[in-house]
């Protein structure tokens, strides 16, 4: 009996000792490891403990150092699998060797398949591929310095199918699909993004402190954990109290304005196309819609466009959907039997903490019926448009909500520390950086920020040639955020544009880096939506960049100006490729110094040259001209394209006389 007890204790001790070996969260069954490069495998153990790796019928041994850290670089391998990896008593299965891509930035890289599904419904419904694996890094911040690992995640090398991809990056989904179709090898897509974050949050302290000491000091301020905790609790409490007061005083709640029998005849009549409510609190809208017997029995979805800000939407007194912030499209499925023959009432309760409540124009507002009701490309065949006329009444007027989240994710270095630093040295094939919207208010330092970001990430991976694809900002008109003007008029006159200035920073930085490329998407945006849906096309352009950067394929990207000269009062721009001929829009010229007043000019493309005709009365004393193209937030009429249809980036260049 004693011998048996001793044996059990001994085995338990062995198990405890072996269990102390651990690997980062990136290492999971189903993972994709990078082909053609040494494969770092690392982790922690007891100091001095032996670590044994078995992989591909070979064994590799090392010993944990005095801090308990260990690392083994497995030899480079060709694409293939599945394989098994054993590290002491830990076992990982279903491992593929292929290409691994890191996608990072803010919300546009994170827009989910669920959001874009109506744009690509048939493709998403029918496509799945176990050779494409998805990994989503969980959001986390760190103010005290770099972390060694990321948080556990539920999307941990899941095979690509509709269910797994539903909450995953649409750009990541389509990039994985596109690259697999090109290479026929396994694809690992790591998405590491956080909506609304500035680039400074993704850069290391070491990269910022020399040139931007105030950014580092700002980050250090938030290292006071007691302050951060107290402020966070105060913000939560203030928000709860604001919400409670609103709920207790909202006439729409107290008088049940969701009830179809509610008399709204005395309410104000508004047209959603030219209405906004500049108040905080709640405002209610109602409209009646007559449904015939045939439609009353069909599966139905309500498309309520996009709204600012929070809405709770009811049909015939029953809540059918709610959205807690401004960006997501409102797509509410109506429960069977709720939509009835005859008169039906849609009621929308807006809750607004600040700003102006309004409908986003140019979005679909309708009832969709039948089996294709979830598609928006093409639109469903059977629809009933909503009347833009609504009855409106204020439920409660409140002061602006006093809560203000600290938002540590917006503080310099916090995301580099928490979710970027721990990923290295996991072997990658390339990086996608899709960010910039949050820096358009101060675009001047962005080029330097971007250079520092690429530099410190390459330093972290010890790979100075790590390929970066910079996705340029899409076209967008932020004026709709205020609710006015309606309709939004095209931007045609020369203007100072923070969006164009940031695009220029992206362009010049990528051009100056031999291991970077620019994916131009200034034709894939939406005037009224900062999160455009055409993510498959974005992924295709990213893929073209990687075709050139990684695989050394001879592919043409967006046209670029390679030289310029002045001839007989005209400016001749020579491009790196042929473009579509014809009259070209959105070119502007100014004196390169002095007051720099820009003037629209006529332009004509022929072959690989664009000729700008200067105005007859334009004779600046400057020794050079400044030439701009597509220098708008939303350059809708910009039309310089390659023969394959790729748009030219906006730019500003100097042309000497």
Name what the model sees in each region.
Residues 59, 576-657:
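C-terminal beta-sandwich/jelly-roll accessory domains of carbohydrate-active enzymes
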Residues 57-80, 306, 313-364:
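Beta-strand-rich ligand-recognition modules
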Residues 19-47, 93-103, 110, 121, ...:
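Non-catalytic, glycine-rich low-complexity segments
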């Amino acid at each position: 009996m004693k011998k048996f007890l001793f044996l059990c204790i001994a085995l338990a001790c062995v198990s405890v000792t072996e269990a102390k070996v651990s690997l980062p969260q990136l290492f999971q069954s189903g993972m994709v490891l990078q082909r053609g490069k040494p494969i770092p495998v690392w982790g922690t153990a007891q100091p001095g403990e032996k670590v044994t790796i078995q992989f591909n019928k070979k064994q590799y041994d090392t010993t944990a150092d005095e801090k308990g850290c260990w690392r083994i670089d497995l030899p480079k391998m060709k694409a293939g699998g599945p394989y098994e990896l054993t590290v002491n008593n830990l076992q990982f299965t279903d491992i593929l060797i292929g290409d691994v891509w890191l996608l990072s930035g803010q919300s546009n890289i994170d827009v989910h398949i669920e959001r874009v599904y109506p744009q690509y419904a048939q493709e998403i419904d029918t496509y799945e591929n176990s050779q494409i694996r998805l990994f989503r890094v969980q959001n986390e911040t760190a103010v005290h310095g770099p972390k060694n690992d990321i948080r556990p995640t539920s999307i941990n090398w899941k095979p690509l199918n509709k269910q797994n991809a539903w909450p995953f990056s649409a750009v990541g989904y389509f990039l994985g699909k596109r690259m697999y179709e090109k290479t026929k090898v396994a694809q690992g897509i790591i998405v590491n993004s956080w909506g609304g974050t500035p680039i400074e949050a993704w850069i290391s302290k070491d990269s910022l402190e020399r040139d931007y000491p105030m950014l580092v000091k700002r980050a250090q301020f938030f290292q006071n954990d007691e302050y951060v905790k107290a402020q966070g609790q105060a913000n939560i409490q203030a928000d709860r109290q604001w919400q409670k007061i609103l709920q207790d005083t909202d006439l729409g709640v107290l008088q049940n304005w969701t009830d179809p029998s509610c008399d709204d005849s005395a309410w104000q009549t508004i047209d959603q196309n030219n209405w906004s409510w500049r108040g905080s609190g709640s405002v209610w809208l109602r409209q009646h819609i007559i449904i015939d017997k045939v439609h009353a029995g069909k599966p139905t979805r309500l498309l309520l466009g996009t709204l600012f800000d929070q809405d709770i939407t009811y049909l015939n007194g029953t809540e059918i959907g709610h959205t807690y912030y401004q960006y997501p499209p409102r797509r509410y499925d109506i429960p069977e039997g709720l939509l009835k023959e005859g008169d039906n009432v849609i009621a929308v309760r807006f809750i607004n903490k600040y700003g102006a409540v309004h409908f986003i124009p140019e979005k679909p507002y309708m009832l969709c019926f039948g089996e294709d009701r979830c598609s928006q490309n093409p639109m469903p065949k059977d629809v009933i448009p909503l009347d833009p006329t609504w009855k409106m009444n204020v439920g409660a007027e409140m002061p602006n909500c006093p809560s203000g989240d600290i938002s540590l994710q917006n503080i310099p270095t916090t995301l580099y520390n928490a979710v970027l630093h721990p990923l290295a040295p996991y072997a990658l094939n390339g990086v996608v950086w899709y960010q910039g919207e949050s820096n358009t208010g101060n675009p001047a330092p962005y080029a330097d920020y971007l250079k520092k970001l690429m530099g410190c990430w390459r330093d972290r991976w010890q790979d100075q040639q790590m390929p970066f694809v910079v996705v340029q900002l899409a076209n967008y008109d932020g004026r709709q955020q205020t609710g006015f003007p309606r309709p939004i008029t095209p931007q045609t006159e020369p203007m100072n544009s923070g969006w164009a200035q940031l695009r220029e920073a992206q362009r010049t930085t990528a051009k100056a880096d031999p291991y970077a490329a620019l994916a131009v998407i200034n034709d894939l945006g939406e005037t009224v939506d900062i999160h455009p849906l055409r993510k498959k096309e974005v992924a295709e352009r990213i893929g073209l960049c990687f075709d050139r950067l990684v695989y050394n394929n001879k592919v043409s990207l967006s046209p670029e100006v390679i030289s310029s000269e002045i001839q007989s009062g005209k400016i001749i721009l020579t491009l790196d490729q042929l473009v579509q001929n014809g009259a070209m829009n959105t070119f502007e010229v100014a004196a390169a110094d002095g007051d720099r007043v820009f003037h629209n000019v006529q332009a004509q493309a022929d072959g690989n040259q664009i000729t700008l005709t200067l105005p007859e009365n334009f004779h600046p004393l400057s020794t050079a001209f400044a030439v701009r193209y597509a220098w708008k937030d939303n350059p809708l009429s910009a039309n310089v394209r390659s023969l394959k249809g790729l748009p030219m980036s906006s730019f500003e260049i100097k042309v000497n006389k």
